[in-house]
Amino acid sequence: MVCGVALTFAAWPAFAANSLPVDAIVLGKTDLDRGYADMYNLQFAQAHAEFTAWMQTNPNDPMGPVSDAAAYLFTEFARLNVLDVDLFDDDNHFESRGKRTTDPAVKAAFQRDLEQADRLATLALTHAPQDANALFARTLVNGLHADYAQMIEGRDFAGLHYTRLASKDAERLLTIAPHMDDAYLAVGLENYILGLKPAPVRWLLALTGAETNAALGKRDMELTASQGHYLAPFARLLLAVAALRDKKNDRARQILASLAAEFPNNPLYARQLAKIR
């Protein structure tokens, strides 16, 4: 998630800096896999249909409604051009972004899905406190809340609150299931985004318990990008942003080109690719 979805560092597997996957979820077999592939391709009606099919056959799985909520969030991101790399490459652009005009119907559906997912995840964790699937779903719930608060409504402090909740669940999840590489994005984003703040701000954020190490955050994002599942394409986009901030334009081009090839119906990647000099 843009600022909401950022852990602990165990044994890091070695991988080449340019070995990002090009078929992370497109070849998936389940309705959830197909739904995420459709979402990243901006085919939102198909994504909702796949997620609805999953919810019908798996009514107690919180991953159904939270994934459907993600499709609603990406609908708003696409409508409002939230995922424009220029917004994140320039601090002044980001700080002056302001509140955006929301779609009330999309917001209502988004919140309804998140409430359902949170309810199912909490119920599952009541019966099985180490339910990895429920913890991951709740990590996504709070990450999506953070994204909406920060990127749509311009409420940074509310977003930080949800980011911390997402990060805590992700840390707990990774102690139980360290192979769930998607979860590293939650902690990595918190570390990376907040680590870019000026030193006095980082110090104050650290007092609140926020993780503020940009270098470690980037390593977490790289792990999700290279070995994640549902969130790998999103992590790759964020790494492209990080590369641009580091003036590594060739690296950004490589990542965006692979995303454009993988998701040809999404014009975002090609559009951003054309902007890189």
Show the residue positions of the predicted features:
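Bacterial N-terminal signal peptides
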Residues: M1-A11
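Sec/Tat signal peptide C-region and signal peptidase I cleavage site
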Residues: W12-A16
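Short coil/linker segments at helix-helix boundaries
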Residues: A17-R34, D38-E50, N60, A71-Q130, ...
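Residue-level recognition of tetratricopeptide repeat
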Residues: D61-P62, D131, M180, L231-A232, ...
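Canonical tetratricopeptide repeat
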Residues: S67-D68, A137, A186, L238, ...
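Flexible, glycine-rich surface segments
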Residues: R219-L238, A242-I255
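A cross-kingdom marker for long, charged
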Residues: V241-R277
